Swiss-Prot record:
GN (gene name): folD
EC number, as in UniProt: 1.5.1.5, 3.5.4.9
Origin: domain of life: Archaea
UniProt protein name: Bifunctional protein FolD
Coiled-coil intervals: none
Record family assignment: Belongs to the tetrahydrofolate dehydrogenase/cyclohydrolase family.
HAMAP family assigned to the protein according to its UniProt record, in alphabetical order: THF_DHG_CYH
Length: 308
C-alpha cells in the first residue's frame, strides 16, 4: 500500500486551494515547533519536518521552523507558550504544528490548551480531540494527521475496517490512541497493546489488521524494544507500519516492521519508505489548507467560502 498516489493527489488538490486563498490575500503558512533535545528524537523530527516543509513549499505555501532545543529545560515550557501565543495572534500564520513527542519536562497539556484550535494542524487541542468522540468526517474535519492518513490509505486500497479485528500496537497520543478511537467509530473491533500488555503475540496473531505505532527499534532501545516480524502475523493480514527512528550516529532509519518477512504473509503491507509517511504528509497538507480557510473566513468573500 504505497502512499505515493494519495500524496500526489493531495498535493494537486492543495495547489488549487492555495491559489483560491491567495485571491483574497491569504498564503498558507505553517509554523513548526521543535522542543525535544533527545538525540534520536531530534534527528528523527528534523527529518520529518524537512519533508513536511518541502511539501508545503511545493504547493505554494510558506514554513517557519522554531527550534527551542537549546533553551534550558526549566524555561522551555514557558518559552514555548510565549511563542505559541504570538503565533496564535499572527494573521499570516495559518497553521501551527508542535512536533511530538515533546520531552517529559515540557507541559504538553498546557501547550495544546493554549494552541488555537483553528490553527491546530495536528488536531491535538482539547477542542479538536472532541471530534473523535463523535461521528467525524474524514474528508472535511481537522483530524490527527497520521491516524487520518492511515484511514485514507486503507480506504484508497479498498481495505474495509468495519467488523474487522484490528490490533493497534502503541497507545501514544499522536497515533495509537486517536487511531483506536477513530477505528471504533468505524465499527472495527479494536485491541490496543502497550508496554504492560501480556501476551502481545496472541492479539497480533489473531488480528485481521495490525497497525504498529511504537517507534522503539531494538537497534536503538534496550527498554521495551519492538519489531513486528512475519511469524507474528496470520496469513493474509493487513499490516500497517508507522513507527520509525533515525540513528543520529549513522543517519540510518530503523522501523517497527520487518518488511521482508511480513510481506511473505500479508495481503496488504505499507512499505517502510513511501507508505504511512507519505499519507501523513498528505493529511498535513489537507489540514493546513483547512486551517488557512479558518483564518481567511474573517475577511473572505462569500465566493471563497463556497470553495471549501
Amino acid at each position: 500500500m504505497s502512499g505515493k498516489p494519495l500524496h500526489e493527489k493531495t498535493k494537486e488538490w492543495a495547489r488549487r486551494h492555495v491559489r483560491l486563498l491567495e485571491e483574497v490575500g491569504v498564503t498558507p503558512k505553517l509554523a513548526v515547533l521543535l522542543l525535544n533535545d533527545d538525540p534520536v528524537e531530534l534527528e528523527t523530527q528534523r527529518r520529518y519536518v524537512s519533508l513536511k516543509a518541502r511539501d508545503v513549499r511545493e504547493v505554494g505555501g510558506e514554513v517557519e521552523i522554531y527550534e527551542l532545543v537549546d533553551v534550558p529545560p526549566e524555561r522551555r515550557s514557558k518559552e514555548a507558550l510565549y511563542l505559541i501565543e504570538r503565533l496564535n495572534r499572527r494573521d499570516d500564520v495559518t497553521g501551527i504544528l508542535i512536533q511530538k513527542p515533546v520531552p517529559p519536562f515540557v507541559d504538553e497539556d498546557l501547550l495544546f490548551q493554549r494552541l488555537s484550535p483553528e490553527k491546530d494542524v495536528d488536531a491535538l487541542t482539547p477542542e479538536n480531540k472532541k471530534r473523535l468522540l463523535a461521528l467525524f468526517d474524514l474528508d472535511r474535519d481537522l483530524l490527527p494527521c497520521t491516524p487520518a492518513g492511515i484511514l485514507e490509505l486503507l480506504q484508497m486500497y479498498g481495505v474495509e475496517v468495519k467488523g474487522r479485528d484490528v490490533t493497534v500496537v502503541g497507545k501514544g497520543e499522536l497515533v495509537g490512541k486517536p487511531l483506536a478511537v477513530m477505528l471504533m467509530q468505524l465499527d472495527a473491533s479494536v485491541s490496543v497493546l502497550h508496554a504492560l500488555t501480556r501476551d502481545k503475540l496472541r492479539y497480533v496473531k489473531e488480528a485481521d489488521i495490525v497497525i504498529s505505532a511504537v517507534g522503539r527499534p531494538p537497534e536503538l532501545y534496550r527498554d521495551n524494544p519492538w519489531r513486528l516480524t512475519g511469524d507474528m502475523v496470520k496469513e493474509g493480514a493487513v499490516v500497517v507500519g508507522v513507527g520509525g527512528k533515525v540513528d543520529p550516529a549513522t543517519g540510518k532509519w530503523y522501523f517497527d516492521v520487518d518488511e521482508k518477512s511480513v510481506a511473505e504473509k500479508a495481503s496488504y503491507l505499507t512499505p517502510n519508505l513511501g507508505g504511512v509517511g507519505l499519507a501523513t504528509r498528505a493529511r498535513l497538507l489537507k489540514n493546513l489548507i483547512r486551517a488557512s480557510y479558518n483564518v481567511a473566513r474573517a475577511t473572505a468573500a462569500p465566493r471563497l467560502l463556497k470553495a471549501f
